[in-house]
Regions:
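Walker A/P-loop-proximal flanking segment of P-loop NTPase domains
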Residues: 1-73, 85, 234-244, 258-264
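Beta-sheet entry/capping signal
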Residues: 63-70, 75-77, 112-114, 171-176, ...
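Extended alpha-helical interface modules used as scaffolds for assembling large macromolecular complexes
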Residues: 1-29, 109, 119-123, 131-132, ...
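Conserved P-loop NTPase catalytic core
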Residues: 101-122, 126, 202-271
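Conserved P-loop NTPase mechanochemical-coupling segment
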Residues: 25-31, 110-157, 178-190
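Flexible phosphate/Mg2+-sensing switch loops adjacent to catalytic phosphate-binding sites
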Residues: 61, 83-112, 139-156, 218, ...
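Hydrophobic positions on the alpha1 helix immediately C-terminal to the Walker A/P-loop
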Residues: 78, 82
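Conserved P-loop NTPase "ATPase switch" module shared by AAA+ and STAND
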Residues: 165-195, 217
Length: 271
């Protein structure tokens, strides 16, 4: 019988599109973690930039996090994996890179996590507060944000929210992960965008002292984008309270090369 190449080379296909909300499905969660390939360069960014920001280490100037990467760079996959590890410590040992697995101990299982994808005409404040109230109710926390026209600033409301959360879940944090964030910002009109950016700045500011963490995925570095020059002043204030982590095409090339190498090893050593 003639053997076909397909009989020799078998490997897990690379998903063309991974959605953040896939991480909410138990049957997909483990697969997302075990199939995430990490280069040494990516491990450096995760271990030195992302995990310290997510951790509760008081020596760190905590900020919001923007994961920047065009379509196909693994942005949603990375956010899914990080949020799963933060939610459940058992996933940390499944990470393929030993340095990342070691660094992940600082966040493993230390958060209640809420993941959202934004495609709405609501204000950013309304989206975030509505989603957080749904999240809090799910986790047995009674809290409602005051109406937008009843607050001078939003930081006090976040402090009250985290105090209520800590009563039910002491020693844990809240991690809000948002995808499709750039598309949402692009859709906003000038005045509305300024208000959204002001709220985003406040989110970055509350991360400094509270156990609240915010991670969003964007397709380009918004602080350097010409399409947002009309709100440059607002963006500068946001930039001070956010860390940008850049993903590149070479990260995808490494994933493909690793998958093919694994397949080649199985051809040479099929046992």
């Amino acid at each position: 019988m003639t053997m076909q190449y397909g009989d020799l080379i078998q490997f897990e296909p690379i998903e063309s599109v991974i959605q953040l909300l896939d991480a909410n499905r138990p049957d997909e969660a483990k697969k997302l973690v075990t199939t995430y390939v990490i280069s040494d360069d990516m491990a450096e960014r995760i271990g030195k930039q992302i995990i310290p920001q997510l951790s509760f280490d008081e020596s760190v100037d905590h900020k919001g996090i923007l994961i920047v990467g065009n379509y196909g760079t693994g942005k949603s996959h990375l956010m899914s994996v990080l949020s799963l590890v933060a939610e459940d410590a058992t996933y940390a040992s499944m990470l393929h890179h030993p340095k990342v697995a070691e660094a992940a101990s600082a966040i493993a299982g230390k958060f209640k996590v809420h993941r959202i994808e934004i495609s709405s005409q609501m204000s950013l404040r309304d989206i975030v507060t509505q989603q957080l109230e749904i999240f809090l109710e799910k986790h047995g926390v009674t809290f409602s944000f005051p109406p937008a026209d009843k607050v001078i600033n939003n930081k006090a409301a976040f402090e009250e929210m985290m105090a209520a959360f800590a009563e039910v879940h002491p020693n844990q944090g809240v991690l809000l992960v948002v995808d499709e964030f750039l598309e949402y910002l692009r859709s906003r009109r000038d005045h509305d965008l300024v208000l959204d950016l002001s709220f985003l700045r406040e989110i970055g500011e509350v991360s400094k002292h509270l156990r609240f963490r915010f991670v969003a995925g964007v397709q380009e570095a918004i602080f350097d984008s010409s399409r947002f020059q009309h709100v440059a002043d607002s963006l500068r204030r946001v930039k001070d309270r956010f860390t940008q982590v850049l993903l590149a095409r070479q990260d995808v090339s490494f994933v493909v090369a690793e998958r093919l190498l694994e397949a080649g090893c199985r051809v040479l050593m099929p046992w």
